[in-house]
Curated annotation (Swiss-Prot):
Post-translational modification Phosphoserine, affected residues: 230
Ranges where the RWD domain occurs: 25-137
Protein name per Swiss-Prot or TrEMBL: eIF-2-alpha kinase GCN2
Record EC number: 2.7.11.1
One GO-annotated biological process of the protein: adaptive immune response
Main location per the UniProt record: cytoplasm
Ranges of Acidic residues composition bias in the record: 731-740
Enzyme class: transferase
Natural source organism: Homo sapiens
Subunit structure: Homodimer; homodimerization is important for kinase activation by uncharged tRNAs. Interacts with GCN1; this interaction stimulates EIF2AK4/GCN2 kinase activity and is impaired by IMPACT upon a variety of stress conditions, such as amino acid depletion, UV-C irradiation, proteasome inhibitor treatment and glucose deprivation. Interacts with DNAJC3; this interaction inhibits EIF2AK4/GCN2 kinase activity during endoplasmic reticulum (ER), hypothermic and amino acid-starving stress conditions. Interacts with MAP3K20; activates EIF2AK4/GCN2 kinase activity in response to moderate ribotoxic stress.
Region Disordered: start-end pairs: 1-25, 138-158, 227-256, 660-750, 766-788
In-chain residues carrying the UniProt-annotated modification N6-acetyllysine: 1259
Length: 1649
């Protein structure tokens, strides 16, 4: 191929080749190169005559094969005879992966290349070019969307796996890094310990040489020298932390570098609740405490230059915060953070403590880092050593020195306990002795809590832990005494005491031995308190000791609850054994976290639910279930549990548990009363440190206050400073009678000796009363009792689980200057009003509203709590008061703060405070709110005397007297609101709802107000663009499949019953026939109405919105749409009926409205002076009742009333005319049982109705009877010479006329005048009536209203247009509950056959279908309801089942075999008859059968009625085992054997059903047998037939064999065995001749023998 790529060369001397030769050589070369892809297209390529080449090459991209090839093409070349001198024809075929454009481009290039190589063989060159072109365009084809999605998913999955692998590798690196870091920390810790050990040895040697010498202030300190102090700093009050919780978390932290100071150091800033910050230079670490997990640093306070010590705890977690923490790990970290942050509140109380034998806490700081939280606490610097050094180096301490140490330890410990602080870890290492020999106690309370938190591994899995300490851990204050005894014993022996039980050496002095026994006795009850130990002879040796040692005084005031309580360290620990804990719901479900408060009522404890992890406040109250107040307690708990409002503390659960506890006069319960003050005052300790503000127990903590802590007094400055007052003079509300109105949620406000008004704890009897008297003696006179004996008694505790509020109280907020923030002030006030409006609506009164009872949660929202005096009674009398109450009211404690009594007295309303008996209502809370609102708007009052004076001036009976600095201009609105609230006349005082609607309150603020403003502006401009946009967005919402399914799921439950539908149709047809007899026509009104607030002021209609945003209503009843229709069409005369659906909205969102079927019958007439239409309406309902025997049995009564008479009664009872509509609504809700009696009374109280007026109103509305019987009551109204008499006469005249007309119409029902009937009074004028029967439901008789209506002339003009003229017609209407009639008939009238058709036409075979169709058409023409069976292939059994299910009596079988005849089957009275009838006579035959059937049913109904009447009159007795015959009626014995227990009414219904069903058969059998019994069972028809196989006449063995065979074939063997046993008993034992086995499930029976 000369000139071609790869062509063989030709020599110069060789002759030139011919065209065929050249062509043949090229083809051979191409075939060799391309092999199978080469194809010679010549038909005779091997023939003698050579044709020009015509070949096809299948070409692929060069060098690619298999899956890499995405393109290919066939190159077809047809050469002319003179090729290659003439260009061949080139074609590209079967292109794959190339677009048409690419193919055309390739072809044009090939043609150009062919022209270029003309004269040379070129096919290989062309093929090579094609392959190169294919290589350039070898690209995968575009994928489908599905393939791209799969590929994308695969890539994402691959990426996810790579990312997971990368994270795993990163975590592995972090773990390895952390392990390395921990190893380095351990090495550093070992170094520090070695250095500390050396320093301790040096200090110990120095202290042994001279205990009285002073140490160099600049010398090194070890862990034994834990404190050093500066007198200036101790006396500097500005560094004490206050109760501010939010700013304390805003810590600043910085590190000094070498440029700032000569040596590198850390600077810590402590926020002290003021603009000034305490700056402390953190120095060298001087030691550590492994037990408490802390590090100790020297520090310098820059403001005074004094030395302080810095304690540091570090909570470290293994991983760094970030995306590599699991959600569970993050929750654990958050939990630990909250626990640490909660310690700040406790520290606020501890910082206030000051005692010569207690080391002072100064300030606290929290520092959050990426992988840890650092807690720094500044403490007083003490120059001295710990007692641990004495144990290590000095040996035993002499007794005289030990006595001195013990007295100081007891003094400090008693001071801590008197302030409700428990040390928890008292040991030699945290008791210091300074240079003067003074003992100092440190590390109390908070150190143990922080140590427990920081020692816990955040990511540690739950496992069994073993304590390193062999000695048991004792909790509470008695635990501190236990540890004190061990400490003293160790000091006396010179070594640690690790023996348990503790053995006291006999070589110790006798008084010291006895002292130690009082400390380390195993029984907590017998262990003495520090107060008692201070009086022990070891501390106070006496020259003459009595022969019989006296027991310390009774410890009634002892506190068994610590301040901050770790898990299982609460007061219950000492009294509840481990076995009791295992069966206690409280200990099983909750983990105790903290005591929130306690008092005479019990204790409130912060707990965490182990299941949901949420925190709750649990109130634990000792109760006596046998007491008369226990029912009252349960009622209050139930009442409060119903409250659910965002501004009310939520009560969740309540339960009672029984526990065993030690009993005795010296052992109060764990939740006993507070600590008495007398002994502390006697020792010279300031009362202000032990009561009121300085109570640490009450101080734990403000951010996490309980929702209902009821040990508060309003005189405290903070919720964190509440402590229960004791003694008769410190009660809060002595005017409240606990027996009548108080309860478990209130404090004991009476003296301790008045036991009748308190809750009875445990088993209180005469002994306990005398014990209380003895305890009073101990308090007042200091007399002592002997040690009690150890006994046990059962105690019951009521546990109440409540919502837990975290922040503070309104008292805290007021004291912090709430008056400056006006916006927040009004917002909180509005939230208080919202909460009060809610509880008042529920019929409750708080009665103890004050700032400390109003809590603020973490979101700064109000939560009203402390329902200690809350009550659900209508009105209360302030009965007898204490004569000296006034003197007690204005009294302050030595600290300058008010007592609890002052707090309540300053807020209580005049009607409650009055000395005379007077009723009061919810408005007493509004008066208290007035005082509260003044305090919110006024600057905090510093002294108690100022506050008493200002608030008493504000309570002036004439008008409130405001302070001069309460500016009129700035506080104008506040003054108006306060004056309105503090009106001494309750009637002029507003309700919470009225005040919320008042213009005196500014609108809601912030985002809520802005949103409301935008929505209001948009909705007012219905033609604006914004309105259309909002509507478009609303109607473009997507409905999810879940909502679509659940919207009407309760309606479409699959419980459709054809019989129910047919019964409803039967009822409607029957009622319509009655209406038509009265000349009524059917008239249905439009479905939708525009929303009408005036008409539906009370009734809640189902509201919807159309596409334009207009609100429309579905009909609530059929009366309003008809009145609108009459008014708009000027109808003057019409009788109409209508049966339509009415709707009720659901309380749940996104649910289909509830549908009811209602029937309306109305008479509109132009005659205005006749009462005959009213009587006709009532008579029509009477006819309906008579039509249905099921309704006759219910004994309906007709209730009548008149709107004029009702109005006269309300006006007579003192109800203003402008409030009549509200009273109508309340009375209507009461009648329909929408409101309880308590709620009704509460709503009346809100209308300022006096108790006398309310009693008079009840006297009238409860009257019901004949008109003559009520005349004395009605005449009392007529005697009045006011407009009321005219109203009464008008109403009485109408009632007399209607009653007379009803008698003339022959109505046999009882007609009663019901003065309390208030059926839709706003819509009616004149006579109103109801048909009422009392039926038994759930063991009580409840009224069922079948129909109700009245005259509604005045309703029509409300719908007339402005141009409408002409007279207003008289309109009377009644609404009938169709659903109730259908249900009654369905349940009581099983004998009524209601068929959807008279005749079923069946084609026997497909060939007869045409005849069947023609026959059916003739039946329809004749007016006979007929159906044709669509499926001609039905079997006989299926046909019978279809007829039975649809209650079809007659079947016409059309078959070609019968010729011109039709076979008619009849299913009548369990008899099947069959008759051949000519096809032409079928219509007449069926008409005759139907007439006969109607007659038989009428006779059967009458017989059934007679039977039912005989049954009701007791004419036969099943118990006698006999039956009686009344004429031709047989009354057999009927036994109902059901698989489950049946109610009496259901059993009677089945018995009546059986007797009616088998009446004909029984009459026929009466002639043959006199002993007949019926056994009714709940089995299907098929099973009934199986019983025919039983052997009755054989022996017992044969019978049992057939029973086993029967049971083996059927399910429900247990029930079937009972049926068989009963049958055998009837046959063998009773020897009954005839037994019917009847299935009340399928209405089928068989005669067994």
């Amino acid at each position: 191929m000369a000139g071609g790529r790869g062509a063989p060369g030709r020599g110069r001397d060789e002759p030139p080749e011919s065209y065929p030769q050249r062509q043949d050589h090229e083809l051979q070369a191409l075939e060799a190169i391309y092999g199978a892809d080469f194809q010679d297209l010549r038909p005779d390529a091997c023939g003698p005559v050579k044709e020009p080449p015509e070949i096809n090459l299948v070409l692929y991209p060069q060098g690619l094969t298999g899956e890499e090839v995405y393109v290919k093409v066939d190159l077809r070349v047809k050469c002319p005879p003179t090729y290659p001198d003439v260009v061949p024809e080139i074609e590209l075929k079967n292109a794959k992966g190339l677009s048409n454009e690419s193919v055309n481009l390739l072809k044009s290039r090939l043609e150009e290349l062919a022209k270029k190589h003309c004269g040379e063989v070129m096919i290989f060159e062309l093929a090579y070019h094609v392959q190169s072109f294919l290589s350039e365009h070898n690209k995968p084809p575009p994928k489908s969307f599905h393939e791209e999605m799969l590929e994308r998913r695969a890539q994402e999955e691959q990426q996810r796996l790579l990312e997971a692998k990368r994270k795993e590798e990163q975590e592995q690196r972090e773990i390895l890094h952390e392990i390395q870091r921990r190893k380095e920390e351990i090495k550093e810790e070992k170094k520090r310990k070695e250095m500390a050990k050396q320093e301790r040895l040096e200090i110990a040697s120095l202290s042994n040489q001279d205990h009285t010498s002073k140490k160099d202030p600049g010398g090194h300190r070890t862990a034994a020298i834990l404190h050093g102090g500066s007198p200036d700093f101790v006396g500097n009050g500005k560094h004490r932390a206050n109760s501010s919780g939010r700013s304390r978390r805003e810590r600043q932290y910085s590190v000094c570098n070498s440029e700032d100071s000569p040596g590198s150091c850390e600077i810590l800033y402590f926020n002290m609740g003021s603009p000034d910050q305490l700056m402390v230079h953190k120095g060298k670490c001087i030691g550590s405490d492994e037990q408490l997990g802390k590090l100790v640093y020297n520090a310098l306070e820059t403001a005074t230059g004094g030395f302080v010590l810095l304690y540091e705890w570090v909570l470290q977690w293994q991983k760094k915060m970030g995306p590599f923490l699991t959600s569970q790990e993050k929750e654990k970290i958050d939990k630990c953070k909250k626990q640490i942050q909660g310690t700040e509140t406790e520290f606020n109380s501890l910082v206030k403590l000051s005692h010569p034998n207690v080391v002072r806490y100064l300030a606290m700081n929290l520092k959050e880092q990426d992988d840890s939280i650092v807690v720094d606490i500044l403490v007083e610097h003490i120059s001295g050593v710990s007692l641990a050094a004495h144990l290590s180096h000095s040996g035993p301490i002499p007794v005289h020195q030990l006595r001195r140490y013990t007295a100081q330890l007891l003094s400090g410990l008693d001071y801590l306990h008197s302030n409700s602080v428990v040390h928890k870890v008292l040991s030699a290492s945290n008791v210091l002795v300074d240079a003067e020999g003074t003992v100092k106690i440190t590390d109390y309370s908070i150190s143990k809590r922080l140590a427990d938190i920081c020692k816990e591994d955040v990511f540690e899995q739950t496992r069994v832990r073993f304590s390193d300490n062999a000695l048991p851990y004792k909790t509470g204050k008695k635990g501190d005494v236990w540890r004190l005894g061990l400490l003293l014993l160790s000091l006396s022996q010179g070594q640690e005491c690790g023996e348990y039980p503790v053995t006291i050496p006999s070589d110790l002095p006798a008084d010291f031995q006895d002292f130690l026994k009082k400390c380390v006795c195993l029984d907590d009850k017998e262990r003495w308190s520090p107060q008692q130990l201070l009086k022990h002879s070891f501390i106070n040796p006496q020259p003459k000791m009595p022969l019989v040692e006296q027991s310390p005084e009774d410890s009634e005031g002892q506190d068994y609850v610590e301040t901050v309580i770790p898990s299982n360290r609460l007061p219950s620990a000492a009294f509840f054994s481990e076995t009791q804990r295992q069966f206690s719901r409280y200990f099983i479900e909750f983990e105790e976290l903290q005591l929130l408060g306690k008092g005479a009522f019990g204790a409130v404890i912060k707990v965490q639910n182990k299941l949901d992890g949420c925190c709750y406040a649990v109130k634990r109250i000792p109760i006596n279930p046998a007491s008369r107040q226990f029912r009252r307690i349960k009622g209050e708990v139930t009442l409060l549990s119903r409250l659910h409002h965002e501004n009310i503390v939520r009560y969740y659960n309540a339960w009672i548990e029984r526990h065993e506890r030690p009993a005795g006069p010296g052992t109060p319960p764990p939740d006993s009363g507070p600590l008495a003050k007398d002994d502390r005052a006697a020792r010279g300790q300031p009362a202000s440190d032990t009561d009121g503000l300085d109570s640490v127990e009450a101080a734990a903590p403000p951010p996490i206050l309980s929702s209902s802590v009821e040990w508060s007094t309003s005189g405290e400055r903070s919720a964190s400073a509440r402590f229960p007052a004791t003694g008769p003079g410190s009660s809060d509300d002595e005017d409240d009678d606990e027996d009548e109105h108080g309860g478990v949620f209130s404090q004991s406000f009476l003296p301790a000796s008045d036991s009748e008004s308190d809750i009875i704890f445990d088993n209180e009897d005469e002994n306990s009363k005398s014990q209380n008297q003895d305890e009073d003696c101990n308090e007042k006179n200091g007399c002592h009792e002997s040690e009690p004996s150890v006994t046990t008694e059962a105690v019951h505790y009521l546990y109440i689980q409540m919502e837990y509020c975290e922040k503070s109280t309104l008292r805290d907020t007021i004291d912090q200057g709430l008056y400056r923030d006006t916006v927040r002030l009004w917002r909180l006030f509005r939230e208080i009003l919202d909460g009060l409006a809610y509880i008042h609506e529920k019929g409750m009164i708080h009665r103890d509203l004050k700032p400390v009872n109003i809590f603020l949660d973490s979101d700064d929202h109000v939560k009203i709590g402390d329902f200690g005096l809350a009550t659900d009674h209508l009105a209360f009398s302030a009965d007898s008061k204490q004569d000296d109450q006034t003197g007690d009211l204005i009294k302050s404690d030595p600290s300058g703060h008010l007592t609890g009594m002052v707090g309540t007295a300053l807020y209580v309303s005049p009607e409650v405070q009055g000395s005379t008996k007077s009723a009061y209502n919810q408005k007493v809370d509004l008066f208290s709110l007035g005082i509260i609102f003044f305090e919110m708007s006024y600057h905090p009052m510093v002294t108690a005397s100022e506050r008493i004076f200002v608030l008493n001036q504000l309570r002036d009976p004439t008008s409130p007297k405001f302070p001069e600095d309460f500016d009129d201009g700035e506080h104008a609105k506040q003054k108006s609101v306060i004056s309105w609230l503090l009106n001494h006349d309750p009637a002029k005082r507003p309700t919470a709802t009225e005040l919320l609607k008042s213009e005196l309150l500014p609108p809601p603020q912030m985002e809520e107000s802005e949103l409301h403003e935008v929505l209001h502006h948009t909705l007012t401009n219905v033609d604006g663009k914004a309105y259309r946009t909002m509507m478009a967005q609303i109607f473009s919402q997507r409905i999810s499949p879940a909502i679509d399914y659940t919207y009407d799921s309760d309606i479409l439950k699959g419980n459709f019953s054809i019989r129910t539908a047919k019964m409803q149709q039967h009822v409607c047809e029957t009622i319509i026939r009655i209406f038509k007899r009265h000349g009524a026509v059917q008239l249905c009104t439009p479905l939708l109405l525009p929303r009408n607030r005036q008409i539906y002021e009370h009734n809640e209609a189902a509201l919807f919105m159309d596409h334009s945003g207009m609100l429309v209503m579905l009909p609530f009843d059929l009366r309003i749409p008809f009145a609108r229709y009459v008014a708009r069409n000027n109808i003057l005369n019409l009788k109409r009926y209508c049966i339509e659906r009415v709707f009720r909205p659901r309380k749940l969102d996104r649910f289909h409205p509830k549908e009811l079927l209602e029937c309306a019958f109305d008479i509109v007439t132009s005659t205005t002076n006749s009462f005959l239409p009213t009587a006709e309406i009532i008579y029509t309902i009477y006819e309906i009742i008579q039509e249905f025997p099921a309704l006759q049995e219910r004994n309906y009564s007709i209730y009548l009333n008149h709107t004029m008479l009702l109005k006269a009664i309300l006006l007579h009872c003192g109800i203003p005319e402008d409030k009549l509509s509200q009273v109508y609504i309340i009375l209507y809700d009461a009648v329909t049982e929408k409101l309880t009696r308590r709620e009704v009374e509460a709503k009346f109280c809100n209308l300022s109705l006096s108790s006398n007026s309310l009693c008079r109103l009840y006297k009238f509305i409860e009257q019901k009877g004949d008109l003559q019987d009520l005349m004395p009551t009605i005449n009392s109204l007529i005697k009045q010479k006011t407009g009321i008499a005219q109203l009464v006469k008008y109403g009485l005249k109408d009632l007399e006329e209607v009653v007379g007309l009803l008698k003339k119409l022959g109505i046999k029902l009882q007609v009663l005048i019901n003065l309390g009937l208030v059926y839709k009074v706003q819509q009616h004028n004149g006579i109103i009536f109801q048909f009422v029967a009392f039926i038994k439901r759930r063991q009580r008789a409840v009224p069922e209203i079948l129909a109700a209506g009245g005259r509604y002339d005045l309703l029509i003009p409300q719908f007339r247009g402005p141009q409408a003229l002409g007279p207003v017609p008289t309109a009377i209407g009644v609404s009938i509950a169709i659903d109730k009639i259908s249900a009654a008939v369905l349940n009581m009238e099983e004998s009524v056959t209601i068929s959807s058709c008279d005749l079923l036409v069946v084609s026997v075979g497909q060939m007869s279908m045409s005849r069947a169709i023609n026959l059916t058409q003739k039946l329809w023409t004749a007016g006979i309801t007929a159906e044709i069976m669509y499926d001609w292939s039905q079997s006989q059994e299926e046909l019978q089942e279809y007829c039975r299910h649809h209650e079809i009596t007659y079947v016409a079988l059309v078959s070609d075999k019968e010729g011109s005849h039709v076979k008619v089957k009849s299913f009548e009275k369990e008899r099947q008859t069959e008759k051949r009838v000519l096809e032409t006579e079928l219509v007449d035959h069926v008409l005759q059968k139907l007439r006969t059937k109607v007659t038989d049913e009428r006779n059967g109904r009458e017989a059934s009625d007679n039977l039912a009447v005989q049954n009701l009159k007791g004419s036969f007795s099943n118990a006698s085992g006999l039956f009686e015959i009344h004429g031709a009626t047989v009354v057999p014995i009927v036994s109902v054997l059901a698989p489950e227990k049946l109610s009496a009414s259901t059993r009677r219904r089945y018995e009546t059903q059986v007797q009616t069903r088998l009446q004909t058969s029984l009459a026929n059998l009466h002639q043959k047998s006199s002993e007949i019994e019926i056994l009714a069972v709940d089995l299907p028809k098929e099973t009934i037939l199986q019983f025919l196989s039983l052997e009755w006449d054989a022996d017992e063995q044969a019978f049992n064999t057939t029973v086993k065979q029967l049971l083996s074939r059927l399910p429900k063997q247990r029930y079937l065995k009972l049926v068989c046993d009963e049958i055998y008993n009837i046959k063998v034992e009773k020897k009954v001749s005839v037994l019917f086995l009847y299935s009340y499930r399928d209405d089928y029976y068989r005669i067994l023998f």
